[in-house]
Amino acid sequence: MSLSGTLPMTRRCFFATAGLGVAPGAASAGESAAGTADLPRAALLSGGDAKTYLLVFDTGQEVMRGLLAFARKHKLVAGHLTGIGAVRDAVLGYFDPHKKAYLRTHEKGQADVLSLTGNLALVKGEPFFHVHVALGRRDGSARGGHLFEATVRPTVELVLTAYPRPVRRKTDPETGLPLLDP
């Protein structure tokens, strides 16, 4: 089954990458025809009802708090986001599976947001953003991890695509983390 001609190129690429739209038994790029054991759990999020927002944060605003406020105001239930920009301070996390907790680091000072990516889902009916970031420092080094907080200077520019079908997270008994449950 081909998606050619039925969806704009960006959607065609997204769904093909997600492993959707491939006929049963047909091998897609990078997959053997022998099996589907490597396929992720998946759910079709939108057939065209997605909304894409440009979000621009200004100096002094806190990114994660702003994202949550935006999601609540617009009653968003699922989505994904990408972005770039610069921040003056950030709190990053690394999940330690042995401690079953995030180890937090405070990144002080100016840094470029080299890449910011994440998703939006519901936890106990409330919007929850899971965001990772790579920060570039003045000396050319980079720091990255789970983003807990980031204070903008001078701007952070995000593209958020929201889907009408709710996606939920459920607590994983092994890690204690709220993981996606499509």
What are these regions (language model features)?
Residues 2-21:
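N-terminal secretory signal peptides and thylakoid transit peptides that target proteins
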Residues 16-17, 26-27, 32:
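Cleavable N-terminal signal peptides
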Residues 21-22, 74:
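Generic hydrophobic alpha-helical segments
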Residues 24-25, 77:
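Generic macromolecular interface patches on structured domains
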Residues 30-74, 78-82, 88-129, 134-182:
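N-terminal intrinsically disordered, cationic/polar leader segments
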